[in-house]
């Protein structure tokens, strides 16, 4: 039985009983069983599902680097269904997406909120998509540090720096002005799939697949 060493330990799957579908393939050498994520990884498909956190980020970065090593000239497909999460974990994924040679095509299924929306926008230009009923949400990073006054001041400066950097990158990927991004991320800003296209977060809404993954 083949198991994906990079498979994400997703809380949603565990909550459903830890059941991961298996795929049986026939070959001249006999049967071979894959978990569904390992089988999709063979097709250069990666899933980002749930909260963005360090463990997930490490696994996704590893998968991106692995697929680039296999074929640096073939697209990688990242499917996103996430409410957001850690900025530093998300930036690790984002930087790896930009670092590797292979184009990373992003697709929102369900929702791409906060850091999920940022990663959606960070896909290769012309290869960023939403499914018709998916939702996208952008906003400014959240803070909540507690401690001594001097430490709170330090962390306040850090979160302001992070907000500025995220806004600059989002402006770059969407084509919106920095002033527009700053205004539109001041509060939770939800978008439909067509609105996400208008805004520049994605390039198109896909209703039917027109080509293999």
Swiss-Prot record:
It catalyses: Hydrolysis of proteins to small peptides in the presence of ATP and magnesium. alpha-casein is the usual test substrate. In the absence of ATP, only oligopeptides shorter than five residues are hydrolyzed (such as succinyl-Leu-Tyr-|-NHMec, and Leu-Tyr-Leu-|-Tyr-Trp, in which cleavage of the -Tyr-|-Leu- and -Tyr-|-Trp bonds also occurs). Pfam families: CLP_protease. It comes from Ectopseudomonas mendocina (strain ymp). This is ATP-dependent Clp protease proteolytic subunit. Cleaves peptides in various proteins in a process that requires ATP hydrolysis. Has a chymotrypsin-like activity. Plays a major role in the degradation of misfolded proteins. SUPFAM superfamilies: ClpP/crotonase (SSF52096). One of its GO terms (biological process) is protein quality control for misfolded or incompletely synthesized proteins. The keyword Nucleotidyltransferase does not apply. The keyword Ligase does not apply. Its EC number is 3.4.21.92. Keywords: Cytoplasm, Hydrolase, Protease, Serine protease. GO terms for molecular function: ATP-dependent peptidase activity; ATPase binding; serine-type endopeptidase activity. It is found in: Cytoplasm. Fourteen ClpP subunits assemble into 2 heptameric rings which stack back to back to give a disk-like structure with a central cavity, resembling the structure of eukaryotic proteasomes.
């Amino acid at each position: 039985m083949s198991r994906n060493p990079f498979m994400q330990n997703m809380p949603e799957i565990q909550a459903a009983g830890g059941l991961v579908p298996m795929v049986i393939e026939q070959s001249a050498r006999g049967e071979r069983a894959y978990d569904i994520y390992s089988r999709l990884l063979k097709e250069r498909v990666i899933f980002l599902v749930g909260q963005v956190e360090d463990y997930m980020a490490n696994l996704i970065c590893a998968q991106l680097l692995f697929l680039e090593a296999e074929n640096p000239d073939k697209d990688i497909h990242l499917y996103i269904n996430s409410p957001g999460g850690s900025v530093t974990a998300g930036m690790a994924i984002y930087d790896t997406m930009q670092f590797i040679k292979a184009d990373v095509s992003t697709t929102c299924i369900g929702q791409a909120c906060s850091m999920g929306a940022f990663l959606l926008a960070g896909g290769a230009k012309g290869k960023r998509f939403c499914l018709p009923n998916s939702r996208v949400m952008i906003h400014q990073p959240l803070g909540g540090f507690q401690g001594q006054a001097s430490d709170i001041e330090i962390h306040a400066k850090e979160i302001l720096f992070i907000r500025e950097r995220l806004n600059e990158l989002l402006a770059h990927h969407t084509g919106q002005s920095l002033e527009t991004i700053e205004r539109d991320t001041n509060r939770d800003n939800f978008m439909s799939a067509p609105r996400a296209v208008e805004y520049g977060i994605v390039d198109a809404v896909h209703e039917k697949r027109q080509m293999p993954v």
